[in-house]
């Protein structure tokens, strides 16, 4: 375990492997033998660019003895996840917190959360009931609609304080009716982004799980025009269908997507190519470090995929949905660094339930535009040595072409 440098920079530890719905209280209970500096204010979660908890947090402690006690908790469990504990320092903590998450410094504490997966016809009253006991500001609920006036299955909620917003994150994966609701950290800036000019509809091609190259069915995807680089026959973006069974919106073609492009930000920075058959379409990832999965069980969920890669913590997961509304048995999993993506390849051919999963690396050492440099990752206890060295030279076209160019492609249908 790599320790941070000694010095007079406070008493800080970093936790990694936290459950996605982890709350401040969960961290306090995990470190119950330690005294946390300033109580709840001493726990700092690290968020991804989409406002989701990254599975990591910094905790400020009162003394060096508290740090030693915290380090003894390394590899102990919180729920079904085992937690790694690293020694850190204030400089590292401040740098990471400044460079992670969707929020700028002036909007980081404005009390917003984003909901995803709302039932069709969900009302503001139901959202208020969902957050019963947490004060929402007047007119603090925003329900975005698409250009046709249909609800998107998402909502923004502003609470009376950032502390209440943090508590609201504890409602992640609880139900409204029969739907599981996902709760993410958000900001006023993100709410404003939903009032951008309407996104354009663009027709692209995507091969079905059993189609041969060149015979892909046509379907409609929604993309941000600024993110398009090239388009030819046979192209598609893997970012179009990442909402699995919880999304509250269907586009009429059988797959679900965010009409305001939030998860399509997956396609808008950190370029890498996806190639299918004779065509190609340049799409982009937020980090540029992706692993493509093939052979997923029909009922596999995002949480199953996160658990599959544990103790690694993917930045996000996109389960692919075909134009017939069924999962394709494939997914794209994005990691914060090239090193983590390479480490994830050690799970190639491992089982998920009764299916073995094929993995394809889609990452290069120079592609990262994320917050963590190699040097910083070393300081945070992450090895920068490749653990799956033979895969780094795989070309994107090679690993993706294999998914559709052969006769042994594994779909997700059992």
Swiss-Prot record:
This chain's protein is named: Heterogeneous nuclear ribonucleoprotein F
Q: How does it assemble?
A: Identified in the spliceosome C complex. Interacts with AGO1, AGO2, TBP and TXNL4/DIM1.
Residue positions where Phosphoserine is found in the record: 104, 161, 187, 193, 195, 265
Question: Record's Gene3D superfamilies?
Answer: 3.30.70.330
Q: Which residues carry this modification: Phosphothreonine?
A: 215
Q: Where is the signal peptide?
A: none
Q: Which CDD domains match?
A: RRM1_hnRNPH_hnRNPH2_hnRNPF, RRM2_hnRNPH_hnRNPH2_hnRNPF, RRM3_hnRNPH_CRSF1_like
The primary gene name is HNRNPF
Molecular-function annotations in GO: RNA binding; single-stranded RNA binding
Phylogenetic lineage: Eukaryota, Metazoa, Chordata, Craniata, Vertebrata
Pfam families, per the entry? RRM_1, zf-RNPHF
Q: Does the keyword Repeat apply?
A: yes
Q: What is the organism of origin for this protein?
A: Bos taurus (Bovine)
């Amino acid at each position: 375990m790599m320790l941070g440098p000694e010095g007079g920079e406070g008493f800080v530890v970093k936790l990694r492997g936290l459950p996605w719905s982890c709350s401040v209280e969960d961290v306090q209970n995990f470190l119950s033998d330690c005294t946390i500096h300033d109580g709840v204010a001493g726990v700092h979660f690290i968020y991804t660019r989409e406002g989701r908890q990254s599975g990591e947090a910094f905790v400020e402690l009162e003394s060096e003895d508290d740090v030693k006690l915290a380090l003894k908790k390394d590899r102990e469990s919180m729920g079904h996840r085992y937690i790694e504990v690293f020694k850190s320092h204030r400089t590292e903590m401040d740098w990471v917190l400044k460079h992670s998450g969707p929020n700028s410094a002036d909007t980081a504490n404005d009390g917003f959360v984003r909901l995803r997966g709302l039932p069709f016809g969900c009302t503001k009253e139901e959202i208020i009931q969902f957050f019963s006991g947490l004060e929402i500001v007047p007119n603090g609920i925003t329900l975005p609609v698409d250009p046709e006036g249909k609800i998107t299955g998402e909502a923004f909620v502003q609470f009376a304080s950032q502390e209440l917003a943090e508590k609201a994150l504890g409602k992640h994966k609880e139900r409204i009716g029969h739907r599981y609701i996902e709760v993410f950290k958000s900001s006023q800036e993100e709410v404003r982004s939903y009032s951008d000019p309407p996104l354009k509809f663009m027709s692209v091609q995507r091969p079905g799980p059993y189609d041969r190259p060149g015979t892909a069915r046509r379907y409609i995807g929604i993309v941000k025009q600024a993110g398009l680089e090239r388009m030819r026959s046979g192209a598609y973006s893997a970012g179009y269908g990442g909402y699995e069974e919880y999304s509250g919106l269907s586009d009429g073609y059988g797959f679900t997507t965010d009409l305001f492009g939030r998860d399509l930000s997956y396609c808008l920075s950190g370029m890498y190519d996806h190639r299918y058959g004779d065509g190609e379409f340049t799409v982009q990832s937020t980090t540029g470090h992706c692993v493509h999965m093939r052979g997923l069980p029909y009922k596999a969920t995002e949480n199953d995929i996160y658990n599959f890669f544990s103790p690694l913590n993917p930045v996000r997961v996109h389960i692919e949905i075909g134009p017939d509304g069924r999962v394709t048995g494939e997914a794209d999993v994005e990691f914060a660094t090239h090193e983590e993506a390479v480490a994830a390849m050690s799970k190639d051919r491992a089982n998920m339930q009764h299916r073995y999963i094929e993995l394809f690396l889609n990452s290069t050492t120079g592609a990262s535009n994320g917050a963590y440099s190699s040097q910083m990752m070393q300081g945070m206890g992450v090895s920068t040595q490749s653990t799956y060295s033979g895969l780094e030279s795989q070309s994107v076209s090679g690993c993706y072409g294999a998914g559709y160019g052969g006769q042994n492609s594994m779909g997700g249908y059992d």
